[in-house]
């Protein structure tokens, strides 16, 4: 075998330059071949790529290169999700302008990505902070406004009085701002919102069409949209206990069957009835103030101790005027969900049970499990939320839950309160409209002008884009656009009077909700999309990214294609942006902790192995280091590996191969130095193998032989079998399976080369064919090595432009077949026979099996039934 080593440092830049010079990855919009659009979620320009990027973009590149080889017009673009808070933080901490920081990072990361050998169409590159991009985003905002998909409304928001900005629920920790530590206030503020709820049912129903999405992602979206069928119930308020002007309390419930188990009503701290109660009760007012200081994240509310205060108000049970229910203000009820009010049935809801146990309100079970004695069925610390029959429920007793729900609905639909039905069937959604206003500088400006005479005025299309000013200061807290001395002061386009710009910018999720459509024609200066192009190139056939984006980004993108359709910018099948979605696992690594408790990086560690024991020591000084758990690579744990170091040491192809080979792509991959070294050894083995095969390939006859001997036929069957299996694995995104088949076939070819010092013409031809196939098989994963091998084999052009070899189906048919064997109905073994063996030969082979003889126990064989190509049954 050849001893020549493959030099990745020389090879990889050379081939990257050749690809770039030939522009082989540029996609033509007028190409009439069938399109294939593969896209990885574009990165935020933090300044450095990490190994997660390497894994993500390698997967997409394998798909892109394979589909290009299969004759598709492949669109595989790259851009930058470039707006966001980190750029402003950099401006504050490092005294560098957000724009400069962002574009410097883009340049650095682009250079890193280019060393990976990705088959990207860089001509389509853009950053979402480019005015040429957000001009069209502003245009779509105005178009959405025209068709009723944008509104301005007042919302209660988390306000950080130190940073002077609105915080997301998740940014409020123990009632304080995550960054400033200030006590957060709930403020009612104007917000621009996208009316995503108009599409709630459509977004839910269309999940059933996304059969190439992971089930877990569809389930997460289904739960987020949260469709529930229930009853809107109007509870009359006892006038003797209620503030003037308040007459009823509306609640939405999915469990009207449990009304006879009600023990209390609960309302949100900002419910109008709570405000009315607070005006007359200082203790209620104090409790409400305390609620406003608590975190508003759903997870925090779910885990916090359930607390409330009795307002003194009483609600009247809809089926019994004498039954009065206390109305509490509770810290677990949110105004944003339902009506901001609930009735509590503690026996069948754990949250309600915790509440009544705290305040000693008692509970009455109204659903009894089948087989339980209703007289002895009690609830203490654990609520029962299963099926059963109604008890303690008057006219509902004995009914199933479904029957009881229907009966309650029918009765309340006919009952009247103030001239209207007490109950009405209603479909409710957990999904809320998308508030996009952010009090930040580094985001897409909202194209609105506020005029004291004309009120809200859209910026005229001719004045787009509204460009961010660059001469901003971050010396003061809050939004730098608010502080700018000139930028916000404008003339009203309607009346010509003095006016001010909207200083809120758009949520950065808006930027990433349509970028995939812009990639289809980023050169269009007049409109966000070119309809005939976007309608032909969309949807994205394969989208790849992290499961952390399963809800917001993916749901907002699904909304955006529908909104863009309503505004005339796109019209695609099912209105879905991503036909196929794949969520890859993370890259994880051991953690290492020094004696002082601080983490050490892998680069600082030496690992020794003694038997089954692994020990870690510091390279500097040799001090022992504790080997900790395997965790996601992160800067805080210092368990990251720099892609530049790996690519610089081993080459991009080695990094790409390792990232694909270690584990199924939807699972986490454990970073291992030994695994990387193993991938590097395989690269060298392939290089030597191709160099060994090259002289034989050169001596092979140009014409295909009329027939093939046994050795040549065996090799050709292995080659075409590998073609079929590797392609199948890539189509299923089972990259590790494809790589295993490549390894297996390389072993077969290596064995053939070792036995073929002077091969016959037919075997030489088969070796040449098989070696060329091997190179094409590993080309999507290791493209630089493949190009070098392609040249060694004397092939013309670039392997990156070569078509996938045709698979000869007759070579996929196995000469033998393995059939299960049953004796008297029980499986006793298998038999392998020639595929075309006659029945008599199969019978003889079966009866010769020791397991069959043992099963018969000396009894005579009555008959042998051979089901061709399926099974053999022996009856004794």
Swiss-Prot record:
Gene3D superfamilies attached to this UniProt entry: 2.20.28.290, 3.10.20.590, HUPs (3.40.50.620), Isoleucyl-tRNA Synthetase, Domain 1 (1.10.730.10)
GO biological process: leucyl-tRNA aminoacylation
Residues at which ATP binds: 635
Catalytic reaction annotation: tRNA(Leu) + L-leucine + ATP = L-leucyl-tRNA(Leu) + AMP + diphosphate
Keyword ATP-binding tagged: yes
GO molecular function annotations of the record: aminoacyl-tRNA deacylase activity; ATP binding; leucine-tRNA ligase activity
EC number: 6.1.1.4
GO-annotated cellular components: cytosol
Placement of sequence motif 'KMSKS' region: 632-636
Keyword Membrane: no
One Pfam family, short name: tRNA-synt_1_2
UniProt keyword list: Aminoacyl-tRNA synthetase, ATP-binding, Cytoplasm, Ligase, Nucleotide-binding, Protein biosynthesis
Span of the annotated motif 'HIGH' region: 43-53
Enzyme class, broadest EC rank: ligase
InterPro entries, per database record: aa-tRNA-synth_I_CS, aa-tRNA-synth_Ia, Leu-tRNA-ligase, Leu_tRNA-synth_edit, M/V/L/I-tRNA-synth_anticd-bd, Methionyl/Leucyl_tRNA_Synth, Rossmann-like_a/b/a_fold, tRNAsynth_Ia_anticodon-bd
Main location: cytoplasm
Cellular location(s): Cytoplasm
HAMAP family, alphabetized: Leu_tRNA_synth_B
PANTHER family: LEUCINE--TRNA LIGASE, MITOCHONDRIAL, LEUCYL-TRNA SYNTHETASE
Similarity comment text for this entry: Belongs to the class-I aminoacyl-tRNA synthetase family.
Name the UniProt record assigns to this protein: Leucine--tRNA ligase
């Amino acid at each position: 075998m050849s001893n020549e080593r493959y030099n990745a440092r020389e090879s990889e830049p050379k081939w990257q330059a050749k690809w770039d010079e030939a522009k082989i990855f540029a996609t033509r919009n007028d190409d009439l071949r069938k399109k294939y659009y593969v896209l990885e979620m574009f990165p935020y320009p933090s300044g450095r790529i990490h190994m997660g990027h390497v894994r993500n973009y390698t997967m997409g590149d394998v798909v892109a290169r394979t589909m290009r080889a299969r004759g598709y017009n492949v669109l595989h673009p790259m851009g930058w999700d470039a707006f966001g808070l980190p750029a402003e933080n950099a401006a504050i901490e490092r005294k560098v302008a957000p724009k400069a920081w962002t574009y410097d990072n883009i340049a650095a990361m682009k250079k890193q990505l280019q060393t990976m050998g990705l088959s990207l169409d860089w001509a389509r590159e853009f950053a979402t902070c480019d005015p040429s991009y957000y001009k069209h985003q502003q245009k779509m905002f105005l178009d959405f406004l025209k068709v009723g998909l944008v509104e301005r409304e007042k919302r209660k928001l988390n306000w950080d009085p130190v940073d002077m900005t609105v915080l997301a629920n998740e940014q409020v920790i123990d009632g304080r701002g995550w960054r400033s530590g200030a006590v957060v206030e709930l403020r009612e503020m104007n917000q621009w919102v996208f009316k995503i709820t108009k599409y709630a049912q459509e977004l839910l129903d269309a999940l059933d069409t996304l059969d190439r999405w992971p089930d877990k992602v569809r389930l997460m979206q289904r739960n987020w949209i949260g469709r529930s069928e229930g009853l809107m119930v109007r509870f009359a308020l006892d006038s003797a206990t209620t503030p003037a002007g308040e007459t009823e309390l509306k609640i939405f419930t999915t469990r009207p069957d449990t009304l006879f188990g009600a023990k209390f009503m609960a309302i949100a701290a900002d419910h109008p009835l709570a405000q009315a109660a607070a005006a007359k009760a200082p203790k209620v007012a104090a409790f409400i103030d305390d609620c406003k200081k608590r975190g508003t994240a759903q997870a925090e509310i779910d885990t916090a101790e359930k607390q409330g205060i009795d307002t003194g108000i009483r609600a009247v049970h809809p089926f019994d005027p004498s039954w009065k229910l206390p109305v509490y203000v509770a810290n677990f009820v949110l105004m944003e969900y339902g009506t901001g009010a609930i009735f509590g049935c503690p026996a069948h809801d754990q949250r309600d049970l915790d509440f009544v146990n705290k305040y000693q309100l008692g509970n009455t079970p109204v659903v009894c499990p089948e087989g339980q004695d209703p007289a002895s069925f009690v609830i203490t610390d654990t609520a029962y939320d299963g099926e059963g029959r109604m008890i303690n429920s008057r006219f509902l007793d004995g009914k199933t839950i479904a029957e009881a729900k229907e009966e309650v609905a029918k009765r309340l639909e006919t009952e009247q309160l103030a001239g209207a039905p007490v109950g009405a069937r209603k479909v409710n959604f957990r999904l809320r409209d998308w508030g996009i206003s952010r009090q930040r500088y580094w985001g897409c400006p909202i194209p609105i002008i506020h005029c004291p005479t004309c009120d809200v005025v859209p910026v005229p299309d001719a004045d787009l884009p509204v460009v961010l000013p660059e001469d901003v200061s971050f010396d003061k807290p809050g939004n730098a656009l608010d502080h700018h001395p000139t930028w916000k002061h404008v003339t009203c386009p309607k009346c010509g009077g003095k006016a001010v710009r909207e200083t809120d910018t758009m949520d950065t999720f808006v930027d990433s909700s349509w970028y995939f459509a812009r990639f289809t024609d980023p050169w269009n200066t007049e409109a966000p999309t070119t309809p005939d192009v976007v309608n032909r190139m969309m949807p994205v056939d394969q989208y790849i990214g992290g499961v952390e984006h399963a809800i917001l980004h993916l749901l907002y993108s699904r909304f955006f294609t529908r909104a863009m359709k309503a505004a005339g910018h796109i019209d695609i099948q099912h209105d879905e942006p991503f036909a196929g979605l794949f969520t890859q696992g993370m890259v994880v690594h051991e953690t290492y902790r020094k004696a002082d408790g601080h983490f050490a990086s892998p680069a600082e560690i030496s690992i020794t192995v003694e038997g089954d024991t692994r020990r870690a020591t510091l390279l500097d000084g040799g001090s022992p280091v504790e080997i900790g758990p395997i965790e996601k690579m992160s800067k805080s744990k210092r368990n990251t590996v720099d892609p530049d170091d790996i690519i610089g040491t081993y080459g991009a192809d080695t990094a790409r191969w390792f990232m694909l080979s270690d584990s199924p792509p939807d699972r986490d991959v454990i970073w291992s130095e030994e695994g990387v070294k193993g991938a590097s050894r395989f690269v060298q083995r392939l290089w030597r193998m191709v160099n060994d095969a090259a002289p034989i390939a050169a001596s092979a006859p140009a014409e295909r032989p009329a027939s093939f001997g046994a050795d040549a036929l065996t090799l050709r069957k292995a080659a075409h079998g590998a073609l079929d299996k590797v392609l199948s694995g890539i189509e299923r995104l089972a990259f590790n399976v494809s790589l295993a088949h490549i390894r297996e076939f390389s072993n077969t070819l290596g064995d053939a080369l070792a036995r073929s010092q002077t091969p016959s013409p037919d075997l030489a031809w088969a070796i040449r064919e098989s070696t060329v196939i091997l190179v094409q098989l590993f080309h999507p994963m290791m493209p630089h090595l493949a190009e070098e091998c392609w040249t060694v084999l004397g092939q013309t052009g670039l392997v990156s432009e070569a078509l996938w070899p045709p698979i000869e189906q007759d070579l996929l048919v196995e000469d033998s077949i393995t059939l299960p064997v049953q004796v008297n109905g029980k499986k006793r073994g298998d038999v392998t026979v020639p595929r075309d063996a006659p029945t008599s030969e199969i019978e003889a082979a079966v009866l010769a099996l020791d397991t069959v003889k043992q099963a018969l126990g000396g009894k005579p064989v009555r008959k042998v039934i051979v089901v061709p190509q399926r099974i053999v049954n022996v009856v004794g």
